[in-house]
From Swiss-Prot:
Location within or outside the cell: Cell inner membrane
Subunit structure, as described in the record: F-type ATPases have 2 components, F(1) - the catalytic core - and F(0) - the membrane proton channel. F(1) has five subunits: alpha(3), beta(3), gamma(1), delta(1), epsilon(1). F(0) has three main subunits: a(1), b(2) and c(10-14). The alpha and beta chains form an alternating ring which encloses part of the gamma chain. F(1) is attached to F(0) by a central stalk formed by the gamma and epsilon chains, while a peripheral stalk is formed by the delta and b chains.
PANTHER family: ATP SYNTHASE DELTA CHAIN
Name of the featured protein: ATP synthase subunit delta
Family from the record: Belongs to the ATPase delta chain family.
Annotated function: F(1)F(0) ATP synthase produces ATP from ADP in the presence of a proton or sodium gradient. F-type ATPases consist of two structural domains, F(1) containing the extramembraneous catalytic core and F(0) containing the membrane proton channel, linked together by a central stalk and a peripheral stalk. During catalysis, ATP synthesis in the catalytic domain of F(1) is coupled via a rotary mechanism of the central stalk subunits to proton translocation. This protein is part of the stalk that links CF(0) to CF(1). It either transmits conformational changes from CF(0) to CF(1) or is implicated in proton conduction.
GO molecular function annotations of the record: proton-transporting ATP synthase activity, rotational mechanism
Assigned keywords, A-Z: ATP synthesis, Cell inner membrane, Cell membrane, CF(1), Hydrogen ion transport, Ion transport, Membrane, Transport
Classification via Pfam families: OSCP (PF00213)
NCBIfam families: ATP_synt_delta, PRK05758.2-2
């Protein structure tokens, strides 16, 4: 609970600055890249959160990372700030909250679509289009693969779940046959 409220504070502050500067989408993209870079490198995460390294050393590393990733100053400053305050563990929550605020601001919804096999681009677009029609909003897909579904897809948009998986259909058939 505490992590969520702290992450929201950082995300809202950065988001309001992004809105003022008209940089919501670019910063959202930059924050996703930053999050992936830090999560993808345990060594980097350790260095940035290890008090053995001075703030100056950590800041120099963040500057090199920001330069390598071609980040704007403000998204990079988030990493400086979290590192300086020993709150690097909040980075993922801050970025996810910022993304939610950006999606809401831009009138988008995110749908988690799980399929038994990877979806090709045309199938993913068809699902996004159908979900957009159903929700009357622009829908962006976060795709996942779960072979246990056997076939079909499960789409979750907010609290709504559309389950068209073969696994569920077989379970429903089994229940019907037992009656």
């Amino acid at each position: 609970m505490l992590m969520g409220s702290i992450a929201r504070r950082y995300a809202r502050a950065l988001f309001s600055l992004a809105v003022e500067q008209g940089r919501v989408e670019p910063w959202n993209d930059a924050l996703q890249v930053l999050k992936n870079a830090v999560e993808g490198s345990p060594d980097l995460r350790d260095v940035l959160s290890n008090p053995v390294y001075s703030k100056e050393q950590r800041r120099a590393i963040v500057e090199k990372l920001a330069s390598a990733l071609k980040l704007e100053r403000e998204p990079a400053n988030l990493l400086f700030l979290l590192g300086d305050r020993n709150r690097l563990a909040y980075l993922a929550a801050v970025v996810d909250t910022f993304r939610s605020l950006a999606d809401q601001h831009l009138g988008r919804l995110r749908a988690r679509v799980t399929s038994a096999v990877p979806l090709d681009a045309s199938a993913a677009q068809a699902i996004a289009d159908r979900l957009s029609q159903a929700t009357k909003a622009t829908v962006l897909l976060d795709r996942a693969v779960d072979p246990a579904l056997l076939g079909g897809v499960v789409a979750q948009v907010g609290s709504l779940v559309y389950d068209g998986s073969l696994r569920t259909q077989l379970e429903d058939l089994r229940k019907t046959l037992k009656q």
